[in-house]
Every structure is written in C-alpha cells, then in structure tokens.
From Swiss-Prot:
Lineage, uppermost ranks: Eukaryota, Metazoa, Chordata, Cephalochordata, Leptocardii
Catalytic activity: a ubiquinone + NADH + 5 H(+)(in) = a ubiquinol + NAD(+) + 4 H(+)(out)
Organism field: Branchiostoma floridae (Florida lancelet)
A biological-process GO annotation: electron transport coupled proton transport
EC code(s) of this entry: 7.1.1.2
Name by which UniProt lists this protein: NADH-ubiquinone oxidoreductase chain 5
Transmembrane segments: 1-21, 28-48, 81-101, 115-135, 171-191, 193-213, 233-253, 265-285, 302-322, 323-343, 363-383, 398-420, 455-475, 481-501, 510-530, 577-597
Entry's localization field: Mitochondrion inner membrane
Main location: mitochondrion
Membrane topology: Multi-pass membrane protein
InterPro entries referenced in this protein's UniProt entry, alphabetically: NADH_DH_su5_C, ND/Mrp_TM, NU5C-like, Proton_antipo_N
Length: 599
C-alpha cells in the first residue's frame, strides 16, 4: 500500500510542477485540489489497512568518489497526513487568492510562488536525508522572502522580508552544524543512520534547536513572524498555517527520538517553548492590528507545539496540533483579509465593530476559528490542545513551566475574545465605504470548507495521531478539565483587558501595556538601540581613530609635517649673509682637516 502511496504522491507533485508553468491561473489550483483528494483517499485506505511501516524511495543522484548523494523520500504517517492537510489548505488559499488579488496584474506569478512555497514544504516533510531537508528548508525561506515582499513599493513589506531572511539565516547556521557533524561523524546524511546511533553529540542537538528556533520563531528569533503579516493576506495565511513556520516544529518531531534521550536538551527545548507561548500570548493581548493579533497567536501556538515535543515527549500530539492549527489559522487570516479588504484596508480593530451584520458568513467563520483556537470543546483545537494540557500536567520535568503553559492558554482565550468583541461584536465604529459583498464564490467557498474542517477534523485525526505509548493513569477531574477551565478564565480576563484599553490615557503611560504593545521592547532594542550603538562606535573609530587619529598623524599629516620642518630648517639656513657663509665654510674645512690629520 505504501508503495502505491509513494508513487502516486510523487506523481502528483510532478503534475503540480507541470501545471505550475501553465498560463491558466486556475489550472494549478485544480491540480492541487485533485492531488489533495487523491492523497486523502490513499490516507483513508492506509488507515483502514492498519499499516504502520515506512517506505523509503531512493535514487542515486551524484557519486563523488566513494560517496553517493541520494535523493530519498520517507513516507510514514506524518508525511501522509501532512500531504493531505497541506494540499487541502493550499487549494483553499489559492481559490481565496483569486478573489483577494483579483486586481493585481501579476496574480499568475503570485499563484506560482504560492505553489512553489507548497512544493518546497512537501519536499521538506518527505525528506529522508539532511541534504534533501536542506533543499526544502532553503526553498521555503526563499519563497517566503519573495512573497512577503510582494508589494515591493511598501518599505514595511521590504523590511519584513529582510527580517525573515536575516533571522532565518541564524537558524540556518544550526542546520549547517547538523550537516557538517553528520558528514564528519557518519559520512552519511540519512535520518536512518542518525537514529541508529547509540549516542549523538550535544553539538548536533544544539544545531537542531537553533534551526527549529529560527524557522519556527521561538523567543529570541521571533520578531520576523509578526512582521511577516505585511505581505498579502494569502501569503500570511499559507505561511502561518501549513508551511514555513511549522518547519522548525517538524524538524523537532523528526529528531524527537534523539532529543528525548538527552535530558539537558529536552529541558532546554521545554523552557524555550514555554517562554515563547507565554510571551507571544502576552504581546497579543495589547495589539490593535487585526492581522498582528492573529500572527502572535501563531507564535504562541508554535511555542505550545515545541513544548509538547520535548516537555511531554509526545511528538504525535505536536503533529496533531500542526494539522488542526493549519485549518483554523488559515481561516482566521482569510477572514481577517476579507474584513480588511471590505473596510478599505483598515486593520485597526478599534475602528471596526458590528461586522456580524455587514459580513455574517465571514463573521461566523471568524467566530468558529477563534473558538477552535481557544480550544472550545468539540472543535478541532480542543482535540489537540486538551490532550496536550493533560499530558503536560502529568509530566515530571518542571511544575513552574507547566503553570506558565496554563497561563498562556488562558491568555489565548483572552485575546481571542477581545478580538471578537472589537471586530465582530458591538456596533460599527466606522463608516463602511464599500459594501462587503459575500456573493463571491472564491471568498465564501474556501472559508466554509475550512470552517467545516475546523469543526470535524479533530474527530477524524485524533484516532490515528494519538501517542503510541499511553500510560494508564487516573487523572482527577480538576486536571482533566484544566484546559476548559483556563479557557473560561481567559474569557473573563478578556473583559478586563477590554475595559482597561478603553481608558483615556495613553497606553505608553501604563508600563505593563507598554511592554505588551511594544513586544517586550525587543524590536526597539535589537533593531534600533544595538545597531545604533555599533554604528556610533564604528563612526567614532573611523572618524577619531582612523581618519583623524594615529593613522592620520603617522601617514599623511605626519609625513607632511616632517617635510615642513625640514623645509623650514633649510629656509632658515638661507640668510644671505656672506660672512656667515665664509665662517661656516672655514669651520667645516677646519673640521675636515683635523679629522684627516688624526687619521
């Protein structure tokens, strides 16, 4: 069965590449749709046949001396599920792009870039070697730069694209460390060879953590993710849901068997994910840009995924949350884009309100997506977040970090309720200049399909993506209902936050809100203060040490000054006094004569 899956999946990728260069913009979207349908049917057959083995398809690409560079594909449950989710979500985003980018003269090129983005991610997920993973890794990085800077006339878009490249370059150093260590130690880049090792050097695992932190925007390398929403909404929807940002989490999932054998690295990843999910949730509470709130929610959920990979030792649950998160996060960005598009590009939620009457279908989908993000029972987010909270509660790593995860979960509900209150609820706070027409099939169709998925996908995926090793535990009712309880607490916090932000005084006068609104002052420190210090030091060194310092005195000014002194002495000697000249000649002659007599 897996042989058929591998052949047909690779065939579908080849067909998508062919249609990628078609001049008809809808042809590629149709190829993605049918490829997704085919992979979904194959996944259903695979699950019913109860096959759990893996398939490796390998071809020798280049042979250098005694080393062969292989192109190899790894088809397991992770690969099969992600193919279905990625193709399905991307198809809906492509259809939404036909509505959102309808006035863009380069819409054909835009859709091709989205397709290449997807293909690079599928190549990364199906990779069986570090070399092939590097190709997909760099592919999603390059395409993210091209798509975020799509509106190249906007300085903010270009700055955001450069941030994405620079921060991901830091993460790429970790991937290069992995490649070099693997080649020197093993002479092989395959995952199978790494899994077979009895001991893996900590240096290699630090590279894994650095690479994942850069690509999945963990704390310290996170500023590029909120800034990436400067690109078109379809780009944000695809980037935040099922492509680039989950690549780092997927890397941790692939190497989780090795990470879980190193307690120090496991604890490091656990704290990194915990601090990321809490910090991002706190920052989302005080943001007023609709897309930025959704972007920070992505960073918070990525931190939760990283936490469960290492802290709970359950990579299956992290992957389950990746799949569930893809459905409702893509829908949230598309709903936000629909609102912003209808409000003449207004993104400030304080100027919205009453959108449930102007755009009822989009508002309902936005509510479903927010509820799924909060983890409301029986939606997709509940089936992934509730097991995560349960398994983190029973882990024996660190109770302090577990408490922070619960606080972050309550904050998720808080900023989601706040966003719903300001945008969909209440009365309109601005005049809608253009009616929000919901009769476009390319607007409503993708939203409805993703809304259905956000409702029923959890029931489908939970059965075959549950942890393989389940401990027989009897949890008290308080821990069992912890996820639902913190969600309710977050809803209550949201009302206080709404009232707090209705005050007349400036947000910057409230230290707590200033910290949240300014993203912990991290962009101010990293993008302004530190570069300014280094530039001032460079200017001081160049102007005071180099140009006007010892080099100036030793070379240009020094040589000129010495020559001037010599010239002045020569000038002073030319006094035009004949008696002086005769006296000097007599003295010099007498001196020379005396020396000759002595010798």
């Amino acid at each position: 069965m897996l042989e058929l899956w591998g052949v047909l999946s690779l065939t579908s990728l080849g067909v998508m590449v062919i249609f990628l260069f078609s001049k008809i913009k809808s042809s590629f979207a149709e190829s993605v749709k049918y490829a997704g349908y085919m992979n979904a049917v194959l996944l259903s057959i695979l699950l019913m046949s109860d096959e759990s083995e893996m398939l490796f398809l390998k071809w020798e690409w280049v042979k250098l001396g005694g080393y062969s560079l292989m192109i190899s594909f790894r088809f397991d449950l992770y690969t099969c599920c992600f193919f279905v989710v990625g193709l399905y979500v991307t198809w809906n985003i492509l259809m939404f792009s036909f509505y959102y980018m309808s006035t863009d003269p380069r819409i054909d090129l835009f859709c091709k870039y989205l397709g290449l983005f997807l293909i690079a991610m599928l190549l990364l997920v199906s990779a069986e070697s570090l070399f092939q993973l590097l190709i997909g890794w760099e592919g999603v990085g390059i395409m993210s730069y091209l798509l975020i800077s799509w509106w190249y006339a906007r300085s903010d878009a270009n700055t955001a694209a450069l941030q994405a490249i620079f921060y991901n370059r830091v993460g790429d150093i970790g991937l290069l460390i992995m490649l070099m260590w693997s080649l020197v130690t093993l002479g092989d880049w395959s995952f199978t060879g790494l899994y077979a090792l009895d001991f893996v050097n900590t240096f290699f695992l630090l590279g894994v953590v650095l690479a994942a932190a850069g690509k999945s925007a963990q704390l310290g390398l996170h500023p590029w993710l909120p800034a990436a929403m400067e690109g078109p909404t379809p780009v944000s929807s695809l980037l935040h849901s099922s492509t680039m940002v989950v690549a780092g989490v997927f890397l941790l999932i692939r190497f989780s068997p090795i990470i879980l054998n190193h307690k120090e690295i496991q604890l490091m990843v656990f704290f990194l994910g915990t601090m990321t999910t809490l910090f991002s949730a706190i920052c989302a509470l005080a943001q007023n840009d609709m897309k930025k709130v959704v972007a920070f929610s992505t960073a918070s959920q990525l931190g939760l995924m990283v936490t469960v990979v290492a802290g709970a030792g359950a990579p299956q649950l992290a992957f389950l949350h990746i799949c569930m998160h893809a459905f409702f996060k893509a829908m949230l960005f598309m709903c936000s884009g629909g609102f912003i598009h209808g409000l003449q590009n207004e993104q400030d939620v304080r100027k919205m309100g009453g959108l449930h009457s102007a755009a009822p279908i989009t508002s309902v989908c936005f509510f479903i997506g927010s509820a799924a993000l909060m983890g409301v029972p029986f939606l997709a987010g509940f089936f992934s977040k509730d097991p995560i909270i349960e398994i983190i509660n029973i882990n024996n790593l660190n109770s302090w970090a577990v408490g922070l995860v619960l606080i972050a979960t309550s904050f998720t509900a808080a900023y989601s309720v706040r966003l719903l209150y300001f945008s969909v609820g209440g009365v309109s706070r601005m005049l809608v200049l253009q009616p929000m027409n919901e009769e476009y099939g390319n607007l409503i169709g993708p939203l409805q399909r993703l809304a259905y998925s956000s409702v029923i996908a959890g029931v489908v995926f939970i059965y075959f993506l549950s942890p393989n090793q389940i401990s027989c535990l009897s949890l008290p009712l308080s821990l069992k209902l912890a996820a639902v309880f913190v969600t309710l607490v977050g809803g209550l916090i949201a009302w206080d936050v709404v009232n707090l932000l209705h005050r007349e005084e400036s947000v910057t006068n409230i230290p707590e809100l200033a910290f949240e609104a300014q993203v912990g002052f991290y962009p101010l420190i990293m993008h302004k203060l530190i570069p300014k210090v280094w530039l001032n030091m460079g200017e001081m060194y160049q102007m005071q040490v180099m140009d006007r310092g010892w080099t100036e005195l030793a070379l240009p000014q020094g040589l000129g000054g010495n020559y001037k002194i010599m010239a002045d002495n020569v000038v002073n000697a030319q006094t035009s006094l004949i008696k002086m000249y005769i006296a000097v000649m007599v003295m010099m002659g007498g001196l020379i004569l005396g020396i000759m007599i002595c010798l």
